[in-house]
Every structure is written in C-alpha cells, then in structure tokens.
C-alpha cells in the first residue's frame, strides 16, 4: 500500500500490470487494523484485462456485511489523506541510516538489495527489515552447541528489548517499519540487533569447552558454520 508514495520503494502491482490487487492499508499506512482496499484495474475483460467488475461485485455482495464500519472506512480515507500530505524524506533518511548500520553486523545478516537477481528475486522493499540468523550458533553450557533460530531472536527482542517483530521463521525475523515510526524507534531497533550481534561475536568461546570471559548465553562459536 505504501509503494506509490516514494521512489525508494518497488513499483506497485498495479503499475506492473496486475488486474486485481488487495492492499492491507493497516500494515504500512496509518489506518486501523482490519482495513484494506480492493483495486480493480478495469471494468470488463474487453477493456484490456482479465478482471470482470460485475462478477467481482456479485461475489463481494454475497459475503459483505450489510452494516459496514464507518469508523474503519473513515480511517482508510484519513490514512490516504495523511500519506498525501507527508514528506517521506525524513523517514527515508532514517531508514537508510538504520539499514547501513545493520548491514555492518558480523553474524546476523540483513536482507539487502544484493539479493536482487538471485532465486527469482526481482526487487526488495527496504521498509521491511529482514534479519537472518543462518550460520549463527548458541553455546548454552547445559545444552551444548545449538543453532540460533529466528524464534529465539524474536523472543530476545520481545523479552529483553520490548520490540515486537511482525513475524519470525526458522532462521529469520521480519520487522515492518513505516513513515509513522520515529527516529528514536528505529534507533532502538538498531541498538537491539547490533547488541545481540556483538554478544554472538564477543563470547570468547574456546573449542575445549572452557569459555574465556563469556558474556552471554547467546554466545557464538565463531569457527562453526551452520548450514
């Protein structure tokens, strides 16, 4: 939903030729939860697309409520108005600063534009902060060497830094940033991730099991790579 508001974002699906697009405006625009927009490129197939507006309207009428929330609809309109009035430059500057900082992490890895062209990746939304834990290891003394998972990173960020991620997977976490995020909030995210990364790096783990100046249970054995 935010792509059209600045050139730093990828082209929107509509700009790339999609006939029907659903945008969850509550994700990245200042709109209430549950709000979304349905975009239809044209009214009939003979107008140059595969969408049939009459059929779509018929199916919507089968499932939609007869008592829509005017609060939610007003929220959508207000969010669009706000975005039209917002200068994206300060947010873009803060976002690029955060990404440069996270790009310097030694073991946690930020998904960046270097991935474009690989494995079918055509573009990248820089407002999504995707951090990979692949290749990092924990060394809790009671459990031995274990892989550091996305779920563990997500838990640490929530429990120790009071930062809620959008989602996590087996070996990554995803944070969503928006124009409504403050510079202070983005800096807090950068502080948390770089600190966790430094704990993985500076643990002083030794292969014989004797840890020298171990600083954290999230310690990484730097001579081990997880595939």
Map each language-model feature to its residues.
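Conserved PLP-enzyme active-site core in the AAT-like
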Residues: 1-115
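Non-catalytic terminal extensions of PLP-dependent enzymes
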Residues: 99-227
